[in-house]
């Protein structure tokens, strides 16, 4: 008889919730690891909605602040990051800049409740993969994340 032990690092998905995910591991019995997605928003409702939308196709972690996101990034590489721009403390734009210093190939999708075409152009010039204004449709954000992860 042969036994196989697989270590799992369980980390809270959201400090507001009492749920956990295995970071960087194969989920369920899938033979191929799921793409990883980090969702950063100080609004628990938006965070939860995005987690619910993507968690069946992506290994998702959520963070309520950029500082918390940095902690996740210390132990995990993400295939894409979605972040709100207007957060207390470190903004989503600053998060984008720090992600680029670490790994400029990681696509960062910025979301905001306020925006203009000028904002869109300037944020893309800073290196954002995309800029999506709230309210956005679920189809729209799904398509943007899919393009970010697949590179298409």
Which ranges hold each PLM region?
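C-terminal output helix
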Residues: 136-146
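Acidic catalytic/metal-coordinating carboxylates
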Residues: 65-68, 91-94
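Two-component/phosphorelay signaling modules centered on CheY-like receiver
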Residues: 44-61
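Receiver (REC) domain active-site loop signature in two-component systems and cognate sites
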Residues: 87
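Conserved phosphotransfer cores of two-component systems
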Residues: 58, 74-76, 98-105, 126
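Alpha4 helix (beta4-alpha4-beta5 surface) of REC/receiver domains from two-component response regulators
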Residues: 94, 115-130, 143
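Active-site beta3 strand of CheY-like receiver
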Residues: 76-82
């Amino acid at each position: 008889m042969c036994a196989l032990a697989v270590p799992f690092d369980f980390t809270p998905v959201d400090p507001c919730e009492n749920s956990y995910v295995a970071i960087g591991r194969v989920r369920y019995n899938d033979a191929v690891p799921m793409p990883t997605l980090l969702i950063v928003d100080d609004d628990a409702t938006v965070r939860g909605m995005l987690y619910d939308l993507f968690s069946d196709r992506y290994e998702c972690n959520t963070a309520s602040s950029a500082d918390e996101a940095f902690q996740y990034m210390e132990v995990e590489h993400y295939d894409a990051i979605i972040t709100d721009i207007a957060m207390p403390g470190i903004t989503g734009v600053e998060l984008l800049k720090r992600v680029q210093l670490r790994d400029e190939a990681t696509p960062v999708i910025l979301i905001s409740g306020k925006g203009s075409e000028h904002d869109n152009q300037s944020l893309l010039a800073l290196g954002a993969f995309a800029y999506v204004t709230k309210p956005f449709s679920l189809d729209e954000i799904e398509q943007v994340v899919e393009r970010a992860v697949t590179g298409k």
